[in-house]
């Protein structure tokens, strides 16, 4: 046995021993000890496979370094190089982002399987014999689903049909799954245009290891599998080709030359795409390879080509990267991702930037170039996995500290992170000082890290909290003179208007001592109804109604039908285009979803006499940091706070019992859910409609019980007339949701519900008739590219518009034509503020870790009458036992009081 083989097998023995000790709850493979063993294992294998000397010494450090450079140039060993790169990074860096641990474990398992297969087939060397004990999550339903898909991938069905589709696609996610220790992939993708909706996704399956960095073209065929009594159509990828959009290469070239000159119909482009496809090498790796390898690849690609402009640009870029000049981190990320909409946001179209190597890059990119792990590009927040793949982490440790604190604040609503929670970092004071010194001078006040007592925080977040609270306190110093008597007269004149004593008392006291009112209440307690009463009370005054989402705004518009009212989303109000800011009263609904930054901007921009803030701290929170609504009542007088308790949404006492127990995390949550029949096994009844007003809610888009598959199941059972548009199928009577494409905005807004009522095809277009969940008149539709053709039986408007069959993904102005998505099922987040007679919620073990208390409570309270929660008994126990309320409000409020003398 050679020395290198012995080294490999010795490392293998240690790894197998560790694998045998792991279980599902122990992510022990992420420990530094195991990472060190894995690194040695991979490096020994690289030395064996890349050396021409069979007696290579495994302990020769210089030879190891040399051979690892060779590894980077070996297309057949790309997986080994990527695994080594992954192991070079600290696992703690990867786990800074949500669900990163699970993704990391899947990556390890995938790479280890590839190593075992490769060494067995190529070297007749048997390693990792107990790989089946590796701790990845498994589920019987998912196993059956994956086995059926794998069978279709491995055995081409005679009934399958190839899809004639040649458009470019963006890969959103590739998730491996494993059947009989063979690797397959679930690939989620969208059309490659600049405005494609992130919700308009398609899933396909393959055994091919596809590079996910760039736009691609797929050869796809359809097949069918059976899940229970249901047939499901699946897409299978037979082959793939990298196909970077020419506009992306043009815009990348513009960064260096200030002009665009790349075409997709030239030899260099074709050869480069073939090289990327065959070797799965991304452009960043190519441009950072050793000189001899780069030059040899370049020579092959540009051979016989008349136009070599692309490689002239690459040569300039390569020099910047090799010398780590200003702008190199921006270029690294752009080379790694090549996404047109991201790239365009970074370009300075009217000149160059001296501070960024005189490239055509905006000065606003500079913070990212200097601190890529703690700041964002213009209009884009990179994922931690992508950053770690393309930018070295050396000399960036202070950024990971800042990222940890920011993530803890935004994800967990912890404004002040305890120093004891930062044990993974050493020399914290030095890191804080280093981070603050690196900040751009205009960002020092807002983004700097501060210490107070035993906590560390980001200055801007604490300052925003303080300013919001101070404004609220100012509004509580005095009330409206004569207010209570004014309300009493109105109540006397409208004796049957209010049938809830709590609302009546709230109305009588609301502005007697304050100019701001906080209205808290669980789902269905009539918060919107109270808004209506207050609005009618002040019918003569000018009023502004704000909410974060279009459905919430439209709900207010339907609820409040009096004069002197404006309705808009928070984003629209804060837009520079909006100049109307003065109102007598401002109402903000679903306040818990509003981040502190936006709340502060509203208070700065809006001029008002009375402010009414309405919401529920137990429902879905702000995507960005937003704790103002939960901590405000700890600072303001009780006379400004009103809690609604009586539930009116449902008359079902059992349902209200479950809502209450979940809201308050009481004992007996599970018993009530099971006893009242709300808990269901994952079975075919998911797809059987029980009520005309019914919705299926999912947390994720992918997987067996994700939105995409549920939509596919239910659409398959729709016998309506159909049309195929690229990779999508649309049928008459499909429910739809309009997306954020802005094609018909603002009149047809994001999340507006609709139903396809007719479809017609011409040679060049598809014409859709859509019934929309609102009523328009002809004046509303002027200047829009759709036609108002009538009304449905229930009065809703029906509109008609066409889409071009031909999709162009080459150009900068390529836009997705279809402005809606199929919506038999929707995400729980999209359902906030909506209610249905019947609600089905699907929770598989794939998503159980992402089910928070707020998300679960929001989901179950969408139901008026019937509720069905589909999950396995094991998942039910784990979800309910892991529900926690975020309890940082009192601690954060206490520190704020001391820090700002509030």
Task: Tell where the protein language model's regions lie, with residue ranges.
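N-terminal accessory nucleic-acid engagement/regulatory domains that precede
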Residues: 117, 123-126, 130-136, 141, ...
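Core RecA-like ATPase module of SF1/SF2 helicases and allied nucleic-acid translocases
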Residues: 525, 564-568, 650-653, 688-902
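Helicase P-loop NTPase motor core
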Residues: 662-706
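ASCE P-loop NTPase helicase motor core
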Residues: 509-512, 516-674
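Conserved adenine-nucleotide phosphate-binding loops and their immediately adjacent elements
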Residues: 482-495
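Conserved, well-folded catalytic cores of nucleic-acid-processing
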Residues: 471-478, 537, 559-562, 605, ...
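Extended low-complexity, intrinsically disordered and solenoidal helical-scaffold regions
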Residues: 2-218
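Pre-Walker A adenine-sensing motif
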Residues: 495-513
């Amino acid at each position: 046995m050679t020395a290198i083989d012995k080294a490999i097998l010795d490392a293998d023995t240690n790894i197998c021993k560790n694998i045998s000790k792991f279980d599902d709850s122990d992510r022990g493979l992420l420990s530094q000890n195991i990472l060190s063993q894995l690194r040695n294992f991979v490096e020994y294998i690289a030395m064996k496979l890349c050396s021409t000397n069979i007696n290579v010494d495994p302990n020769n450090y210089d030879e190891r370094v040399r051979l690892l450079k060779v590894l980077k140039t070996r297309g057949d060993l790309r997986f080994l190089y990527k695994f080594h790169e992954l192991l070079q990074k600290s696992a703690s860096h990867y786990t800074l982002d949500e669900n990163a641990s699970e993704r990391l474990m899947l990556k390890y398992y995938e790479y280890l399987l590839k190593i075992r297969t490769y060494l067995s087939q190529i070297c007749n060397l048997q390693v990792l014999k107990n790989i089946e004990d590796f701790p990845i999550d498994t589920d019987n339903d998912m196993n059956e689903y994956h086995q059926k898909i794998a069978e279709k991938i491995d055995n081409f069905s005679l009934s399958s049909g190839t899809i004639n589709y040649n458009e470019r696609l963006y890969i959103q996610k590739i998730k491996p799954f494993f059947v009989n220790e063979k690797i397959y992939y679930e690939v989620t993708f969208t059309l490659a245009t600049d405005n494609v909706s992130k919700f308009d996704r398609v899933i396909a399956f393959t055994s091919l290891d596809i590079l996910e960095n760039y736009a691609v073209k797929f050869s796809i065929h359809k097949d069918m599998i059976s899940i229970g009594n249901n047939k499901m159509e699946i897409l299978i990828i037979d082959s793939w080709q990298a196909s970077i959009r020419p506009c992306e290469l043009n815009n990348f070239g513009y960064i260096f030359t200030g002009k665009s000159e790349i075409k997709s119909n030239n030899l260099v482009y074709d050869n480069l795409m073939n090289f990327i496809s065959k070797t799965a090498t991304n452009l960043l790796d190519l441009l950072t390879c050793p000189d001899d390898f780069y030059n040899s690849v370049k020579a092959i690609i540009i051979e016989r080509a008349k136009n070599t402009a692309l490689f002239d640009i690459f040569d300039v870029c390569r020099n910047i990267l090799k010398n780590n000049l200003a702008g190199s981190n921006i270029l690294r990320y752009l080379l790694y991702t090549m996404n047109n909409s991201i790239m365009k946001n970074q370009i300075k179209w009217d000149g160059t930037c001296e501070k960024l190597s005189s490239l055509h890059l905006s000065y606003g990119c500079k913070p990212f170039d200097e601190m890529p792990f703690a700041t964002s590009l213009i209009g884009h927040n990179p994922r931690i996995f992508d950053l770690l793949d393309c930018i070295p982490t050396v000399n960036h440790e202070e950024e990971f500290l800042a990222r940890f604190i920011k993530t803890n604040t935004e994800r967990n609503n912890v404004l002040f992170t305890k120093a004891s929670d930062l044990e993974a970092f050493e020399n914290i004071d030095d890191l804080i000082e280093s981070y603050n010194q690196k900040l751009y001078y205009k960002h020092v006040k807002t983004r700097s890290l501060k210490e107070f007592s035993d906590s560390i925080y980001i200055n801007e977040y604490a300052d925003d909290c303080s300013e919001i609270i101070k404004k609220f306190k100012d509004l509580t110093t005095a009330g409206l003179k004569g207010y209570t008597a004014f309300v009493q007269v109105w109540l006397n004149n409208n004796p049957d208007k209010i049938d809830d004593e709590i609302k009546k008392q709230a109305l009588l006291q609301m502005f007697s001592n304050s100019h701001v009112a906080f209205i808290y209440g669980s789902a269905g307690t009539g918060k919107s109804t109270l808004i209506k009463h207050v609005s009618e009370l002040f019918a003569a005054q000018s009023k502004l109604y704000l909410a974060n989402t279009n459905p919430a705004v439209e709900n207010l518009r339907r609820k409040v039908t009096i004069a002197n009212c404006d309705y808009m989303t928070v984003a629209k109000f804060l837009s520079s285009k909006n100049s109307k800011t003065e109102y007598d009263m401002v109402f903000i609904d679903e306040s818990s979803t509003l981040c502190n930054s936006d709340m502060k901007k509203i208070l700065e921009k809006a001029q008002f006499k009375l402010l009414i803030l309405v919401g529920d701290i137990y429902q879905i929170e702000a995507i960005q940091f937003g704790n103002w609504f939960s901590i405000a009542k700890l600072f303001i007088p009780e006379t400004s706070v009103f809690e609604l308790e009586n539930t009116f949404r449902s008359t079902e006492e059992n349902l209200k019992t479950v809502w209450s127990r979940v809201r308050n995390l009481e004992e007996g949550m599970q018993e009530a859910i099971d006893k009242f029949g709300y808990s269901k096994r994952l079975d075919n009844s998911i797809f059987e409609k029980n009520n005309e007003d019914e919705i299926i809610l999912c947390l994720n888009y992918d997987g067996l019980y994700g939105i995409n598959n549920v939509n596919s199941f239910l659409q398959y059972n729709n016998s309506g007339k159909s049309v195929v548009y690229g990779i999508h199928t649309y049928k008459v009577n499909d429910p739809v949701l309009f997306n954020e494409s802005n094609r018909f905005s603002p009149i047809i807004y994001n999340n507006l519900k609709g139903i396809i009522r007719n479809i017609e095809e011409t040679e060049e277009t598809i014409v859709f008739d859509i019934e929309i969940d609102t009523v328009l008149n002809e004046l509303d539709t002027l200047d829009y590219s759709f036609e108002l053709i009538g009304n449905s039986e229930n009065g809703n408007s029906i509109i008609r518009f066409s889409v071009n069959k031909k999709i162009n993904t080459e150009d900068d102005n390529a836009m997705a034509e279809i402005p809606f998505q199929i919506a038999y099922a929707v995400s729980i987040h999209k359902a906030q503020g909506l209610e249905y007679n019947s609600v089905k919620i699907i929770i598989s073990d794939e998503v159980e870790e992402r089910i928070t208390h707020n998300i679960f409570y929001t989901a179950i309270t969408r139901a008026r009458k019937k509720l069905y929660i589909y999950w396995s008994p094991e998942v039910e126990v784990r979800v309910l036992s892991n529900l926690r309320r975020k309890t940082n409000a009192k601690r954060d409020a206490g520190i704020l009081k001391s820090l700002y003398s509030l």
